[in-house]
Amino acid sequence: MRKSIRCGVAALALTVPLVFGIGAGTATAAPQESVLQVPVVTGPEFGPVGVPGGLIQTIPIKATVGEKPGEVRFAAADIRPYYYQFNYRHLTVNWRNLSTGAVGSAGLRHWIDEVDRTQPANQGGSQAYRLPLEVTAQTGAGPVFVTVTHDRENPDASNALIPGVGVLFVP
């Protein structure tokens, strides 16, 4: 009889914390990085206003989810070295949460700005250098549809032959 009472007390001592969640940690997933299913395809690039890399170029876009609930971090997967014509080019990320209908957009650079912007000759003009290399979008949780265009200044237009496209699940 004593042995069965001891076993019952031990079983009760082990199950009570589990039932009430005592000692159980909160399950969290590690952030997940992926590349959008379709990269941005730009072009044609030629002549004095083109950039190195060929007539038609691709810009893969990476997205990181799971760092914070309802947020996605976007950046170009391959950051390009500085070239003076990049001063007039940037990416625009547009997104729509398919569960809530929430929408948003943000601009970012896909190139390193190596120019000393403290010099008066290097200030003014193009504003693309002011954009960050990565942006965080407050999309909310759920499936999020993303498009990314490659835009240029002078004239203001998109030169994306095919916009980057992807669908993400944001926790």
Show where each model-derived region lies.
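N-terminal prepro-regions of secreted/extracellular proteins
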Residues: 1-50
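Secretion-targeting segments and adjacent low-complexity export tracts
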Residues: 24, 64-67, 79, 132, ...
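Mature exported/compartmentalized surface modules and terminal targeting/interaction regions
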Residues: 32-41, 77, 161-171
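A taxonomically broad motif for mature regions of secreted/extracellular
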Residues: 38-40, 45-48, 52, 67, ...
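Short, surface-exposed binding/anchoring microloops in extracellular/periplasmic proteins
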Residues: 43-93, 98
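Generic short beta-strand segments
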Residues: 75-79, 90, 109-113, 147-152
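Extended, solvent-exposed segments with strong compositional bias
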Residues: 96-127
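Extracellularly exposed regions in secreted/surface proteins, prominently low-complexity, repeat-rich
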Residues: 121-171
